[in-house]
Amino acid sequence: MADAPIAPVVLVILDGWGYRQTTDYNAIAVANTPVMDSLWEAYPKTLIRTSGKDVGLPEGQMGNSEVGHLNIGAGRIVPQELVRITDAIEDGSIFQSPVLINLCDEVKGRGGKLHLIGLSSAGGVHSHLCHLLGLLDLAKLHSVSDVCVHAITDGRDTNPTEGVNVIEAIQAHIDKIGVGRISTVCGRYYAMDRDRRWDRVKKAYDLLTEDGEGDGRSASQILKDFYAQDITDEFILPTRVAPGAIEPGDGIIFYNFRPDRARQLCYAFTMPDFDGFERDLIQPLSFVTFTQYDPKLPVKVVFEPQSLTNILGEVIAKKGLRQFRTAETEKYPHVTYFFNGGLEQPFEGEDRELIQSPMVATYDKAPVMSAEAVTDTACAAIKKGIYSLVVMNYANPDMVGHTGNMEAAVQAIEAVDRCLGRLLGCINKMGGTVLITADHGNAEYMRDEEGNPWTAHTTNPVPFILVEGEKRKIPGHGANVVLRNDGRLADIAPTILDILQLPQPNNMTGKSLIEPAGFDVKTNRTPVRISL
């Protein structure tokens, strides 16, 4: 006789769906969201924290998708590379890194240039300005005189025109220590694509490898001139400021600590079988990355990966249960690589399906994105009745929120709400239980206090809703499930194990969001009741 279909636990991550009581420029509050509104009213819910020390970041630092999914999947607060690298600069240990010292020696020995490439930003999501300044100090300390800074401007995790202030800070540090020059500026739209849009990456690559003098303008003046044309930091056209092309004999330090948007440019420079566009492999070329972007990359790594064991996916696999992951291109690495603690390979019994994101310049042009296809894929997997855990991500609130387009963000939120309704129907038919949450805020704050577009993440909490299924009841609770109101992302994995009745490993230090059976709301405390 065939096994009975499995009623799954489904974790739905609404990427960038934060909570903010104020409705001004709040795309989530303004949008028509009957599904989420009804769930918030009818089912156990709470708010959880997604930023700062609650996710292993410095106090007050906004969370992001990488950090969020890493914490969710690990079931513990994971110390982040931002803190790890900043500490190494502040205590001076980075200046004694054998990897960096060897690179400096190789460059000097060949009479080459040292190129510093990365996101020039104080956003702290992919990189940090203090890390670049620390590398300039490293070059001076080790007597590397020919140093080229290739500034990738942000405008996505920061204010759209904050780049000029960052550039001026870099130039001030260069002037102070007498080492380095800003050779190029380029928006992250080109240099940090992660969706295999090789035409964009090629423009950045060509800028870095084709030399020239520039036209005499400073880097800050170039940015100001672009601003006057309504071209903001993210979209700064690849522009040469001063001589300093990457040539044989040179060395590169790519100082982004987050891998997903650094990989493609690194592939172009280092992989012999690269086929994204035609180019000649530059050799010899010493190439160092701050963190491991991809184990296949033939580069040296300064900060080796931290080992995370007994994470959620691993626990599920060890129990012989099957799991499924799906998202569209923009968030696929997050439900796979990051959710699995930085492991590329799936666990045994872990199936994945990637949905292609729309090929548009910016997602406000297609705010529905691929949410319908993600829903179709998740429903098809759920109906198979073979998965105990399904993890999925709706990218719309975050990706459209990053555009700063309020109207499009509202459309994105409404699209996700419609898809959520259809998804719940599929899960309900299987008797499964649903956990609905987010990895960080974004779309709830689309303008700053002065009315300017806000394209970055926020430090706001996010909703967490538990929709209990008929065939996947919370053990021992009956109809009286109560959620804690002091949770964080690291508590989600223990909650899932709680529902699946699986033991929680000792090094998974998060705590289930479900209060113990028999919890008396009246005599202990009253959970926070907030309406969206």
UniProtKB/Swiss-Prot annotation:
Binding residues for Mn(2+) 1: D398, H402, H457
GN (gene name): gpmI
Pathway: Carbohydrate degradation; glycolysis; pyruvate from D-glyceraldehyde 3-phosphate: step 3/5
Cofactor: Mn(2+)
Name of the protein described by the UniProt record: 2,3-bisphosphoglycerate-independent phosphoglycerate mutase
UniProt keyword Metal-binding, yes or no: yes
Family to which the UniProt record says this protein belongs: Belongs to the BPG-independent phosphoglycerate mutase family.
Keywords: Glycolysis, Isomerase, Manganese, Metal-binding
Domain of life: Bacteria
Catalytic activity: (2R)-2-phosphoglycerate = (2R)-3-phosphoglycerate
GO CC entries: cytosol
GO BP field: glucose catabolic process; glycolytic process
Record's subunit section: Monomer.
